[in-house]
């Protein structure tokens, strides 16, 4: 029986579909929401304005986006009558962060979208799903 589910979210429509899947298939499970700021993206959070000649129009943008995505995902989950027990914003390699979180928090299942944002990121995030499938020690459901 699945008691806890990790749903990595990125603000894409497939993240919402993953939550919808959880509400249908695991309605009584405790839900963990995870947003991972890619360590490369996080490097842009540095306040470059402190260095002469550099300008950053949005310090902390990646982290702020993560907080917004988590808040939206919580609302979506609660509207689907799911119980959210944790929201985590992590910085690192997305696939490693997802697998590590699933292991450390002893979740029973991971449900995630097959890919996320458009363009080049779509291919990168598609490879994230593949890497999580290969490395996870718990069952993984990929939603399309």
What are these regions (language model features)?
Residues 1-6, 16, 21, 124, ...:
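Terminal disorder- and signal-encoded targeting elements
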Residues 3-50:
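Small/aliphatic-rich secondary-structure junction motif
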Residues 25-30, 82-83, 138:
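Short glycine/proline-enriched coil/turn segments at helix->beta-strand junctions
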Residues 32-34, 85-90, 141:
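General small-molecule cofactor/ligand-binding pocket signal
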Residues 52-68:
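A short acidic, glycine-rich active-site loop
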Residues 75-110:
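Structural beta-alpha unit
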Residues 104-144:
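Gly/Ser-rich helix-loop-strand patches that form or flank binding pockets
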């Amino acid at each position: 029986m699945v008691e806890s589910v990790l749903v990595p979210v990125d603000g894409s429509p497939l993240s919402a579909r993953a939550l919808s899947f959880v509400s249908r298939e695991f309605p009584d499970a405790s839900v963990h929401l995870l947003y991972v700021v890619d360590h490369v993206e996080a490097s842009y959070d540095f306040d470059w304005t402190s260095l002469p000649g550099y300008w950053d129009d949005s310090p902390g943008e990646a982290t702020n986006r993560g907080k917004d995505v988590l808040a939206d995902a919580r609302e979506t989950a609660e509207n689907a009558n799911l119980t959210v027990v944790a929201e985590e914003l992590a910085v690192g390699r997305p696939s490693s962060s997802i697998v590590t979180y699933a292991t450390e928090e002893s979740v029973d299942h991971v449900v995630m979208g097959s890919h996320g944002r458009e363009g080049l990121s779509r291919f990168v995030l598609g490879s994230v799903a593949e890497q999580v499938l290969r490395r996870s020690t718990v069952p993984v459901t990929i939603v399309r």
